[in-house]
C-alpha cells in the first residue's frame, strides 16, 4: 500500500514538472514588431531599415524570433504564465539573448548580443 502511494506521488510530481516545463500556450500566435538599435558596443551593428517589421511566433509556449539580417539566426525560448519570456541562440560572436513581456497583444523586449543592443516592440 505504501509503495503504491509513493509511486502515485512520484507520478504526480513528474506530471506537474512536465506541465511547468512546457510554457504557457495562452500567448500562442504570430506577432510583428519593430527593432530599434539602442546601443553599439563593437561598431559592427546594423540599424534596421525604417518601417521594417520582424516576426515573433509563439506555439505551445515556445518562442521563436528570426533575428535577421544582423546575425542570421533564430532565437528560441519559452514564455511563462505571467507573460515573461526569454529566447536565445549562439552566434559566431557569442550568445544573443532576448528577454521580454507580453501584455494582451502587445510585446516589449530587449535583445542583447556581444556587439549590439536592440529593443523590440509590436506594432498593432
What is the meaning of each model-derived region?
Residues 6-16:
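Bacterial N-terminal signal peptides
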Residues 17-21:
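Sec/Tat signal peptide C-region and signal peptidase I cleavage site
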Residues 1-4:
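Positively charged n-region of N-terminal signal peptides that target proteins for export
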Residues 23-123:
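Central antiparallel beta-sheet cores of small beta-barrel/beta-sandwich binding domains
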Amino acid at each position: 500500500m505504501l509503495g503504491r502511494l509513493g509511486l502515485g506521488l512520484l507520478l504526480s510530481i513528474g506530471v506537474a514538472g512536465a506541465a511547468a516545463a512546457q510554457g504557457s500556450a495562452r500567448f500562442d500566435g504570430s506577432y510583428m514588431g519593430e527593432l530599434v538599435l539602442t546601443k553599439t558596443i563593437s561598431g559592427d551593428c546594423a540599424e534596421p531599415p525604417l518601417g521594417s517589421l520582424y516576426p515573433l511566433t509563439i506555439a505551445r509556449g515556445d518562442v521563436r524570433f528570426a533575428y535577421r539580417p544582423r546575425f542570421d539566426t533564430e532565437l528560441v525560448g519559452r514564455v511563462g504564465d505571467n507573460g515573461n519570456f526569454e529566447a536565445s541562440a549562439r552566434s559566431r560572436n557569442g550568445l544573443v539573448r532576448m528577454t521580454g513581456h507580453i501584455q494582451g497583444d502587445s510585446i516589449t523586449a530587449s535583445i542583447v548580443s556581444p556587439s549590439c543592443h536592440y529593443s523590440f516592440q509590436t506594432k498593432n
